């Protein structure tokens, strides 16, 4: 808290303001007297009370299992891109329903599993915690398919990333139509990491690209390069940033590699990669 008294042209003004994240020291500005009173910071955030009615239902869409044509790996969804947004939604008081492109059991990308021998995601205690819950494992084992979904039943849509979407989302007309239905109705419409591949071709009902005139993000070329070098091979069949920058009339942006970065442009919400899922969910 900073109290400032200004004396100028024989008129005295008193100003009390709150400064966040910085301290300003001013001296002898028109007779200014500065009193540093305190540097108090407060954080208050709603957390839904256990057992209270939900605020609505959010649809999360993941890739059905696939096999990478580049690496031969079994692929699907990235754990943190499901669990971190899921935690945000649940704590905010929303019910979540998980569906997939084809329905049925889902495949977790190996490197995203916190129990994987590689140790790549061993730090992901949020995913590890969900994996101990029977209801969560039941949800992964039995998803509805897209054709069973009525957008009117949900308040928002969130596309889960992973390696699978590079094969199952891009050019998926059924998913494009579903996502556009949410978007055109004004509902929050989100995609994170490789699930943003859908936006390379998705169109609105007037035939225009959904990202026309929009600022958005997705997995960066620099991040693809890092991943390729880490495993010693090319992992993805194409790169989202490279493809997005070929599109006229859209603004694709990325931040520092693997930093948490999300953008809301109207009701279109995008997150850069696996570390951006919670940030994107907060924007929903």
Give the positions of each predicted feature.
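Glycine- and acidic-residue-rich phosphate-binding/metal-coordinating active-site segment common to enzymes
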Residues: 189
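Short, thiol/selenol-centered motifs that function as redox-active sites or metal-ligating centers
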Residues: 192-195
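Extended, subdomain-level signal for the structured scaffold at the beginning of enzyme domains
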Residues: 4-185, 198-284
């Amino acid at each position: 808290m900073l109290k400032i008294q200004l004396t100028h042209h024989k008129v005295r003004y008193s100003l009390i303001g709150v400064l966040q994240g910085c301290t300003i020291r001013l001296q002898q500005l028109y007779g200014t007297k500065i009193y540093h009173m305190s540097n108090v910071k407060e954080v208050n955030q709603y957390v839904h009370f256990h057992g209270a009615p939900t605020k609505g239902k959010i649809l999360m869409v993941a890739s059905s299992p696939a096999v990478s044509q580049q690496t031969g790996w079994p692929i699907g969804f990235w754990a943190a891109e499901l669990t971190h947004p899921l935690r945000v939604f649940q704590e905010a008081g929303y019910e979540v329903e998980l569906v997939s492109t084809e329905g049925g059991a889902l495949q977790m990308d190996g490197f995203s599993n916190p129990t994987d021998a590689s140790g790549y995601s061993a730090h992901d205690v949020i995913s590890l915690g969900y994996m101990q819950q029977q209801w969560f494992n039941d949800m992964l084992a039995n998803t509805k398919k897209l054709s069973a979904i009525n957008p009117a039943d949900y308040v928002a849509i969130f596309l889960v990333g992973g390696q699978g979407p590079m094969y199952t989302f891009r050019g998926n007309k059924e998913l494009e139509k579903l996502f556009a239905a949410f978007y055109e109705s004004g509902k929050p419409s989100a995609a994170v990491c490789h699930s943003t591949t859908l936006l390379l071709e998705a169109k609105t009902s007037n035939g225009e690209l959904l990202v026309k005139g929009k600022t958005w993000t997705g997995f960066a070329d620099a991040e693809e390069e890092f991943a390729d070098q880490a495993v010693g091979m090319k992992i993805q069949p194409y790169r989202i940033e490279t493809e997005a920058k070929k599109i006229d009339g859209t603004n694709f942006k990325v931040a520092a590699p693997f930093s948490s970065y999300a953008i809301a442009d109207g009701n279109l919400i995008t997150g850069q990669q696996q570390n951006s899922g919670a940030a994107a969910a907060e924007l929903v």
